[in-house]
């Protein structure tokens, strides 16, 4: 019985994001922004789900299994304005959105998963938060 419990915990760990390479398996899919923070002129601004709806703001990112992505956004932020399609790449806890035509438009985010939600964090060189967003997958949206 004890061996069975250890085996099930080991199997669970193998499927978890802590195992090298398995975290990229959680990324592919359609992700919808439902909350974000941005640091504007020394003020940390927070917009929740109701704020996004009332302001008609949206950000939808589709990550394909072949490491392509597409982005649809209507946000009053300059972060995503120059990049709509490209490739994505993961190294440790960073995801890079790569512009195939101009590397200067590449975007790098720290990312994490919590309760099946995707968190993306982008800071500038001084540590100021340019974007800290929380995303739900369409799968979890349909389950609601």
Language-model-detected regions and their locations in the chain:
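Lipid interaction determinants
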Residues: 1-144
């Amino acid at each position: 019985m004890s061996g069975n419990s250890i085996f099930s915990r080991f199997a669970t760990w193998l499927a978890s994001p802590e195992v090298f390479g398995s975290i990229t398996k959680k990324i592919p899919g359609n992700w919808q922004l439902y909350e974000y923070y941005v640091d504007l002129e020394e003020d940390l601004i927070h917009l929740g789900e109701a704020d996004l709806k009332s302001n008609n703001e949206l950000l939808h990112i589709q990550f394909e299994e072949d490491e392509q992505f597409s982005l649809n956004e209507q946000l009053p932020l300059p972060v995503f304005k120059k990049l709509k399609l490209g490739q994505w790449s993961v190294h440790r806890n960073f995801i890079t959105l790569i512009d195939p035509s101009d590397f200067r438009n590449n975007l790098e985010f720290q990312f994490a998963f919590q309760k099946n939600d995707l968190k993306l964090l982008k800071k500038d060189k001084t540590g100021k938060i340019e974007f800290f967003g929380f995303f739900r997958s369409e799968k979890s949206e349909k389950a609601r």
